[in-house]
Each structure stands twice: as structure tokens, then as C-alpha cells.
Amino acid sequence: LNFLRRISTRRLLSICALALVIVIGGTAVALATSGGGPKPPAKPLANAVHDALEAPSVPGISADIHFTNNLIDASSLEGKDPILAGATGRLWASPSGGGKLRLELQAEESGNDSQVLIEGHHFQVYDGTSETVYEGMLPEEKDEAGEEGVPSVEKIQGEIDRLGKHVELSGAIPSDVAGKAAYTLQAAPSHDGGLLGRVEVAWDAANGIPLRAAVYSSESSSPVLELEATGVSFEAVPDSVFEISPPAEAKVVDLSPEEVKGPHGDPTKALGAAAVGAAVDFPLAAPQSLAGLPQAEVRAIEVDGQTAALVTYGKGLGGIAVIESKSEAGGEEGELGLPKVVIGDVKGEELGTALGSALRFSREGVDYIVVGSVPPAAVEAAARGL
């Protein structure tokens, strides 16, 4: 969060998109067309997941890809940004070294290609349009298999039951993906899903390799984000393929979480309006309710080396978050000419996407960013409530 306040609109959009590219690319290889191949036999989801985990591993994956991004209206973009507008490219994956994945998205005409690289828990994204490298660490997860091997069907079913309390799961749907027998899983928030409709993932019934991933908005039957590939090959990939060298002059942005410090430079875990209000050096705006949503949490965070505040309202993806930080001169102006809205006696800049909205404005020395998986009208109402 140490750069959100001063980042340009184009870069902010790129970060939102590349974050979803990492999620999709890290879990799936999508196939472009459906063929006439057979479908696998029907089976419970727990059994399908167990069989996928138990399937023999492949030495590597190579594929041509097509990335579709309908988060925002492409007509509002200046130039061809492969992360924002979608693009064709290549994908490689290897199980060596803790797991490696590389996505190459090729920009039309400009030649400003973008690269996504995941090695173990570390990720690096090069945005060729802005000549910026974003890097950081992915959350570490426990190895469920570990020394005990693949989890039992009963254990997997227990996890599915736990997840089912919050997410509606379709079960393992026998599918035909590009002539390959596959199982498709549809997952949708059971409540408080905001603008997120559902996520679909399909995997090869024979080897457990993910074959398709797509994200849908609650307001459209077409995917907002989709990763498609053709000509998939399950062969070993040389380590040299995963060596990416961005230009030496490229700007590097570290997205790793930072330690939050108090006014005296000491680490702080301030929680609650009173504690956070005492930790920041600006008037904290934290009403008990905002846009009809009850206050959920007030937490101290780090912005530009200074203590700032994160105030959340509501629950789940239908909630709203407010980031408040002390204003500084020199912030970059938006590059896409986004709509301006009036918030009280000041003007704000608003970004609306198929999966959520964000609005930022400054008032009396404080910068505000209001964001949520909600329509623009909801973040506008929240901003006015501040």
C-alpha cells in the first residue's frame, strides 16, 4: 500500500489485473475450444479431487495462450496494454525448484510485452507499457500431502463441507475440454459476494492438470477474466525459460507486506478507532456505519513509511474498505481520464470495473481511497459519508 496514494490510474489498473492474472495463471491452463472427446464418469467432488492429487505428475507444460480481460471498457484505454486489454502469448510451467510458472503476454504493435513469473512463493510481473516490475511473495500454505501422502477422501470431504458453509459448490461436473476428459467445478459466494458471480476451474481427469479457469461477474454471463491456451504439451521445460531479465531502467515496486510502525518508529498493531486515531497524525474518519454497512474493523497500516488507517465496513466481498493517509505533494495524475465525481466540496476520481469500484479523493490534508466489490454508486455513497 505504500504507493497507492501516488500511483497513476493506468498502473493501478495494471496491478488489479495482474493480481488476477497471477491467481488464474498460478492455478490453471485454459484450453481455447471444446472438442468431441469423451467425458469422464460422474463421481463425487471429493473423489475427483483425491484422484487429481494422486495422479502422476507431468514433467512440464508448454502452451500458446490467449488472455481475455473485460474488467474495464477497452475503449477507455490509450494504447495497447496486454495486461489491461488482454493479449495472446505463451505459458510454461515446471515442477522443479518448488514449482515455476511463466506467462508471456504480447502487446500488439507497440512491442511492450508483459511477463509474469512465479517461482515457489515469489512472484515477479513486468509491465512493458509502464516499464515497471512488480514483485512480492505469495502466502505460504501447509503441504497437505507432506510425509503422509495424499489426503484421504474423508479428509477432503471434510474440507469441502467446511468451505461449503461460505461458498456454493457445483460438484465435479464431467466435461469435455478440447477433446480431453475433464471435471469442472463452479464456485460462487453463498452470500456477501459483491459483484463476484462465480469462478470456474476445470482439470484433466487423467493427470489432474488444471485445464481452464475463468472469473465471472454477477452482472454478466460472459467471463470477466479468462485464460485460454492451445497446443498444450506435457513435456519438460528447460530452466532457462524461466530466466526473465527486465530492462535495467525498469522501476521496481515491492508489493510485499510491510511492518507497520507507530509515531515513534516502533512496530504497532493498533486496532480500534481510539488506538488507530492516536497512532496517525491526521484526523481519523471512522463512522460507525457507512453506506448502510456497519463498521467491521479499524486497523493501522503502512503508507509511504507513515502510519495510516484501514477501516472496513460490512462482511465478505460485499463490504467496503477505506484507506486513509496523510497527503503529500507530488502525486501522479490519472492517465486514463476517468470520470470525476464531487464528494462534498472536493472532486474525486472514480474507477468502475466489472468486479468492483474504487474512488479516491483528498480533503484537508488527508487522502482517501474507497474500494469494494460494489457498483460505483456504493463507493460514492461511502465517500460522501466520510
Task: Give the role of each language-model region.
Residues 4-8, 24-52:
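C-terminal region of N-terminal signal peptides and the immediate post-cleavage residues
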Residues 65-66, 102-106, 183-191, 213-216, ...:
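Short beta-strand segments that buttress and anchor functional surface loops
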Residues 71, 79-87, 258-366, 374-384:
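Short, solvent-exposed recognition patches
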Residues 87, 92-95, 116-126, 198-214, ...:
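A short, surface-exposed beta-strand/turn
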Residues 88-151, 218, 222-226, 359:
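An acidic-aromatic
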Residues 104, 124, 170-253:
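Gly/Pro-enriched, hydrophobic low-complexity segments
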